[in-house]
Amino acid sequence: MDKNIKREIEIKRAKLLLLKNKENCTDAVSSSNKEGPKQISEDQLSNFLCKILKPTNLTPQTYSLESKSSNLVSDCELKISSVYQSYSSTFNVSNHVPSISKTVNIRETSKHLKHSTKAPKCSLPTSALEIDHLNNFLHSSAKILDRALCDQSNQLFTDYTVKKKSKKNKSQLEENGLNHLFTFQDEKITLNSVVNSISYSSFFEELLITSYAKPKEALRTRGLAIVWNQRWKNSPESVLKARSEITVCKPSPFHPQLIAGGAYNGQVFLWDLRQGQYPVSFTTIISGGHLEPVTDITYINNPPSNNIVTCSTDGLVHIWEPDMFSRPSETICLSSQVDSSSQCIPATCLSFIPENNMEFLVGAEDGKLQRGYRSDYSETKAVQPSNVSYEGHNVFISGIDVMTSNSQNVFLEKNKDFALTSSFDWTVRLWQCSPSRNQHELVPSNDLDEQVIINSCKTFTHKAMVFDVKWCVSEPCCFASVDALGNLNLWDLQKDVEAPVTSDIPDGKPLNKIAWQPEKRNLACGGLNGNVHIYKHLSPNLAN
């Protein structure tokens, strides 16, 4: 009897265990199944448990990258990483916000995505076009971020409860009309370089274009020009390059994106800021370009097109159309007689008469100041009659600037054109472009016409060689000059005609180029060490 009872108990226990296992399996298959538990065989149960214990869909859907060729993915990662490296080299957010990392590792990011529990969509660019778009986006975004971080607003932390500082605390330099703002320099790009030219943009008042050279090297280096932004002082806005050293570079006053430059080998380059850092057009010797270094560039409005005018030490002035650099539209020979065998005049600087596209003044290496007239035809023409000469300088003329006076002064006459010339003879001279009869000196000559000598109105003596001079745009009686001692001199003809009203030596190095900001009071000067200094000119009314 006892044996039968034990046997029945074991049978019931086995049935209960089997029912319990079946209920657990059905709950694992689907908790939302409304039908009752079904009979599952041991093979089906084992297969089901294997599917649960060894899932095949745990890795995220990142096979789109692996399904492509491995070479394309590796190239893509390398290109993207190079873009991030160039981005981090030009703009390091961690310099301003330390909590942000400087670099981004693409490979570490991809590993993290592959081992994550979720499956995010991968949007890494795989084509060259997408990588170029990403590169342009990063560079443009970096500039915008850096401009915002570098914006130094004096009104941001103004405390209106504190008494304003007294004017007595101002430096003597500020009281006399100059205030040093900041300095443009880049040790990686402009180290051991010399500033060849400085020019402001006529469309964007904050943009400044400078060209550089490295005279210490035995061979002439490739050309370098930098577009600086006065609102973004940490790094250049754009870097322009050329095959030869850029001797002069000026932006177009008629197009906001075009910049023309002259080179040491005689070529003329034209850059478009929308097309990258290399020229979109350039001249050659075969096309009738210059044979010697280009010394100056200017623009004239000659409807229906706007022309680029270049002069060189080869004694020629070329007039170019921006859309056709195959040959100059006009050539002017800087000599007294076209058909004579005399040597051409080596031009060093050039400036057109305001509101007159037919007349210009050009300085030469021998100190002569010549008056030129454009021809209505494409043939070579003499620069001026042989019986007219400007007497004053006797050595190299380094700079020239012409303006129309809108004020009356002892030396300036209203609505008349006046020119300033700087020279290596330690002087700056003032000339009237259309002098009156009493400024002429008649000298007997064997020719039928009398020799006419035009003398300068005033001579401003300096303490060293003068490298450049420019009229002030906002103050008609003021001009600035720079010399070999590193002096930035500010002259005011209404205050003193014998000495500058103020002077400053930015860093003790010689200064050789200067430029005024259009319709503003900012002044830029560059030196032989590659630094560009920005000053603010305070008029007497503002200074007082």
From Swiss-Prot:
Keywords, comma-separated and alphabetical: Cytoplasm, Meiosis, Repeat, WD repeat
Subcellular location: Cytoplasm
Keyword Metal-binding in annotation: no
Highest taxon in the source lineage: Eukaryota
The keyword Repeat is assigned to this record: yes
Main location class: cytoplasm
Pfam families the record matches: WD40
GO CC term (a single one): cortical microtubule cytoskeleton
Gene Ontology biological process: dynein-driven meiotic oscillatory nuclear movement; transport along microtubule
WD repeats: 241-281, 289-330, 342-387, 402-441, 461-501, 506-544
Entry-linked InterPro entries: Dynein_IC, WD40/YVTN_repeat-like_dom_sf, WD40_repeat_dom_sf, WD40_rpt
GO molecular function: ATP hydrolysis activity; dynein heavy chain binding; dynein light chain binding
Primary role: Has a role in meiotic nuclear divsion where it promotes the movement of 'horsetails'.
Similarity annotation: Belongs to the dynein intermediate chain family.
Protein name stated in the entry: Dynein intermediate chain 1
Lineage: Eukaryota, Fungi, Dikarya, Ascomycota, Taphrinomycotina
